[in-house]
């Protein structure tokens, strides 16, 4: 479910040594499965553990996860990185915004999951997003861009060299291409 690097484990042990005995960490997701999902880590005193919580045992502490957050923390990674700017904990949870779908789920569900978990987080860097409006009978994903992507002069590159390339690779043999249904209007909202 959650991978915690050795560096992060050592950091948690150091932090927890200054807390009440029996205190562990809690890893959670606020607003799981939505575009506003946020992950967090907090102290978890012994009396804050619920019967339905999952305990993951690490070196010197447990990570406690509530029942609602658990599926959204699948494949989550916590690391403690040090660079010239200092040290910090990083938490990557690729399934926080959308629950992972099974490999045999309908194609439309797998495309929507890919959009929410991989594509939209990248587009969000430019204030944009994309939604799947249709999956045609002849195997084309019809997308609509919004936010900073609407009217952006780089949208064709994003569509063909980015999104379509990723989707055709991931859904080889199932998807024939990607089309843009957006009526692009350049304006101050456009990224480029």
From Swiss-Prot:
Q: What does this protein do?
A: Involved in iron-sulfur cluster biogenesis. Binds a 4Fe-4S cluster, can transfer this cluster to apoproteins, and thereby intervenes in the maturation of Fe/S proteins. Could also act as a scaffold/chaperone for damaged Fe/S proteins.
Q: Which residues bind [4Fe-4S] cluster?
A: 149, 152
Q: Which organism is it from?
A: Alteromonas mediterranea (strain DSM 17117 / CIP 110805 / LMG 28347 / Deep ecotype)
Q: Which GO terms describe its molecular function?
A: 4 iron, 4 sulfur cluster binding; iron ion binding
Q: Which cofactor does it need?
A: [4Fe-4S] cluster
Q: List the disulfide bonds.
A: none
What family name appears in the similarity comment?
Answer: Belongs to the NfuA family.
Q: How does it assemble?
A: Homodimer.
Q: Which Gene3D superfamilies match?
A: Fe-S cluster assembly (FSCA) (3.30.300.130), HesB-like domain (2.60.300.12)
Which PANTHER family did the record assign? FE_S BIOGENESIS PROTEIN NFUA (PTHR11178:SF51), IRON-SULFUR CLUSTER SCAFFOLD PROTEIN NFU-RELATED (PTHR11178)
Task: Give the protein's recorded name.
Answer: Fe/S biogenesis protein NfuA
What's the gene? Answer: nfuA
- Which InterPro entries does this one have? Fe/S_biogenesis_protein_NfuA (IPR017726), FeS_biogenesis (IPR000361), FSCA_dom_sf (IPR034904), HesB-like_dom_sf (IPR035903), NIF_FeS_clus_asmbl_NifU_C (IPR001075)
Gene Ontology biological process:
iron-sulfur cluster assembly; protein maturation
What is the cofactor note?
Answer: Binds 1 [4Fe-4S] cluster per subunit. The cluster is presumably bound at the interface of two monomers.
Which keywords label this protein?
4Fe-4S, Iron, Iron-sulfur, Metal-binding
NCBIfam families attached to this UniProt entry: PRK11190.1 (NF008392), YhgI_GntY (TIGR03341)
């Amino acid at each position: 479910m959650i991978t915690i690097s050795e560096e992060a484990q050592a950091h948690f042990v150091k932090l927890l040594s200054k807390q009440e005995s029996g205190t562990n960490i809690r890893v959670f997701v606020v607003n799981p499965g939505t575009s506003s999902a946020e992950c967090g880590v907090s102290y978890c005193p012994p009396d804050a553990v619920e019967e339905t919580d999952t305990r993951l045992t690490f070196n010197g502490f447990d990570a406690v996860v509530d029942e609602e957050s658990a599926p959204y923390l699948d494949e989550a990674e916590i690391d403690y990185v040090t660079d010239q700017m200092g040290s910090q904990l990083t938490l990557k949870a690729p399934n926080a915004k959308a629950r992972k779908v099974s490999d045999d789920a309908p194609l439309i569900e797998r495309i929507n999951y890919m959009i929410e978990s991989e594509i939209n987080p990248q587009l969000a860097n430019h204030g944009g997003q994309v939604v799947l409006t249709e999956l045609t009978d002849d195997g084309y994903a019809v997308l609509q861009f919004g936010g900073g992507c609407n009217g952006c002069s780089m949208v064709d590159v994003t569509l063909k060299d980015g999104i379509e390339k990723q989707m055709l690779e991931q859904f080889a043999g199932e998807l024939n291409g990607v089309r843009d249904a957006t009526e692009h209007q350049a304006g101050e909202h456009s990224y480029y």
